[in-house]
């Protein structure tokens, strides 16, 4: 008798990860296969999860019971603690956020890139910029962008779907973990996923000539297996990132500020905004400082 059909009054739960949301159902992949090798189950949620206010997200580790192996159906009965979670989109246990922007077609807007990076920093996980369409620039120009981002506190990767080595570098970076792509539409996110996971063949769309924005082609959040290990999530695109309304959160979203504080720089006041306060211990000679000041004003 299999574990899910046991008559025990306290049935053993099977551990699995939520791979996708489909309407009102969860697609869960079991950590260990079922009696006939089944790994994927279409699951409902037990009412007690909803009554307890527990939202189940893609990426969650869950316990399932009530398995109907012939129909590949079950129910999610428990939710494990998360190492991290994103609210927009709803995604759990992410280890890296990959911010994808194009170096050309459309040309890279440093202010837009900065805002996407700040939005990604609100997740509290590692942020990695991916500079797509690198083949449309001279190598020196693409490398100059990587050097510029190093000054912002990031190790960026230049990528091109026609350059197998650059795709391999991304796959190596993602091996073993869970990562999510974000960034404006039209920068090649779906093309990148197709290159990383060739079996998917996600639909792509050309960039519109008038607005230089892409027509988004991803409709829902789903985890995809990477050939070298790890999981990758695509998210519905958006043209502007979301920044925190609370200006107190803003300073620590900048690696330029975090790195100075971690290196021992100290300010006289605990709530120093690093503007004109007396006793501010930070060096302000970094490229994005004026942008930081502007964002503080916007949040006021």
Predicted features, each with a name:
Residues 6-12, 24, 47, 52-62, ...:
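Helix-rich effector regions associated with P-loop NTPase G domains
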Residues 19-25, 29:
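N-terminal "pre-motor" subdomain/linker immediately upstream of P-loop NTPase catalytic cores
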Residues 35-46:
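A short macromolecule-binding patch
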Residues 102-154:
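Phosphate-binding glycine-rich loops and their immediate beta-loop-alpha structural context
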Residues 136-187:
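Canonical P-loop GTPase G-domain recognition
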Residues 185, 190-191, 195:
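Walker A/P-loop
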């Amino acid at each position: 008798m299999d574990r899910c059909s046991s008559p025990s009054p306290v049935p053993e739960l099977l551990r699995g990860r939520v791979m996708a949301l489909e309407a009102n159902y969860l697609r869960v992949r079991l950590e260990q296969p079922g009696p006939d090798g089944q790994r994927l189950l279409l699951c409902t949620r037990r009412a007690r999860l909803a009554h307890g206010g527990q939202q189940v997200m893609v990426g969650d580790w869950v316990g399932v019971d009530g398995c109907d192996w012939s129909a590949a159906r079950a129910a999610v009965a428990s939710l494990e603690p998360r190492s991290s979670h994103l609210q927009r989109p709803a995604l759990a246990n992410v280890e890296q956020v990959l911010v994808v922007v194009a170096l050309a077609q459309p040309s890279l807007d440093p202010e837009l890139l900065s805002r996407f990076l700040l939005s990604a920093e609100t997740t509290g996980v590692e942020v990695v910029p991916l500079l797509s369409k690198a083949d449309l620039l001279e190598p020196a120009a693409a490398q100059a962008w990587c050097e510029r981002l190093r000054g912002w506190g990031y190790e960026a990767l230049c990528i091109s779907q026609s350059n197998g080595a650059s795709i391999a570098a991304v796959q190596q970076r993602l091996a073993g973990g869970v990562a999510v792509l974000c960034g404006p539409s039209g920068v090649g996110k779906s093309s990148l996923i197709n290159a990383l996971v060739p079996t998917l063949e996600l639909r792509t769309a050309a960039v519109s000539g008038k607005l230089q924005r892409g027509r988004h082609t991803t409709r829902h959040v789903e985890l995809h297996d990477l050939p070298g290990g790890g999981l990758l999530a695509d998210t519905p695109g958006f043209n502007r990132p979301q920044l925190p309304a609370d200006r107190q959160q803003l300073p620590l979203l900048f690696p330029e500020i975090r790195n100075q504080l971690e290196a021992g720089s100290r300010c006289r006041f605990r709530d120093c905004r690093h503007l004109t306060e007396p006793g501010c211990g930070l060096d302000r000679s970094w490229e994005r400082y004026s942008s930081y000041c502007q964002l503080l004003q916007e949040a006021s």
